[in-house]
Amino acid sequence: MTTSFYFLLMALGLLLYVCQSSFGNQHTRNSDTPKYRCGSDIPNSYMDLCFRKRNDAGKKRGQASPLWQRGGSLSMLKARAKRNEAFHLQRAHRGVVEHCCKRACSNAEFMQFCGNS
């Protein structure tokens, strides 16, 4: 009886794992799903997407960014990004507000507004 109970418990656990892995992600949002970015979402998205894009090379080399090591620098950069958002987030004649606030844009579309600095 102990062996059959153990086998039943293992089969039930495996079934639960398969069901959770196949149906568990059904309602999660794709990371590149278009979304509206207005107000403080714009500089926050800038920090998340553009700053990460610039520091990926250092992470690939195994070097941690010095800004992540110092907590105060990140808040300073967020404040700077908010002040300079018009400078950093322009593309041709259309701005990021027109493109991503008035209509939804994906992460890839938003990253086109990242400055080269």
Curated annotation (Swiss-Prot):
Keywords, ordered alphabetically: Amidation, Carbohydrate metabolism, Cleavage on pair of basic residues, Disulfide bond, Gamma-carboxyglutamic acid, Glucose metabolism, Hormone, Hydroxylation, Secreted, Signal, Toxin
Cystine connections: 38-101, 50-114, 100-105
Record note on quaternary structure: Heterodimer of A and B chains; disulfide-linked.
Function: This venom insulin facilitates prey capture by rapidly inducing hypoglycemic shock. It is one of the smallest known insulin found in nature and lacks the C-terminal segment of the B chain that, in human insulin, mediates engagement of the insulin receptor (INSR) and assembly of the hormone's hexameric storage form. Despite lacking this segment, it both binds and activates human insulin receptor (long isoform (HIR-B) OF INSR) with only a 10-fold lower potency. In vivo, intraperitoneal injection of this peptide into zebrafish lowers blood glucose with the same potency than human insulin.
Signal keyword on record: yes
This protein's name: Con-Ins T3
PTM annotation (Cysteine amide): residues: 114
Residues passing through the membrane, by range: none
Gene3D superfamilies reported in the protein's UniProt record: Insulin-like (1.10.100.10)
Residues the record lists as 4-carboxyglutamate modifications: 98, 109
Tissue: Expressed by the venom gland.
Recorded family membership: Belongs to the insulin family.
Subcellular location: Secreted
Protein's GO biological process: glucose metabolic process
Residues with 4-hydroxyproline modification: 34
A single Gene Ontology CC term: extracellular region
Recorded GO MF terms: hormone activity; toxin activity
Signal sequence segment: 1-24
Keyword Cell membrane recorded: no
Upper classification of the organism: Eukaryota, Metazoa, Spiralia, Lophotrochozoa, Mollusca
Pfam families in alphabetical order: Insulin (PF00049)
Propeptide stretches in the record: 25-29, 53-94, 116-117
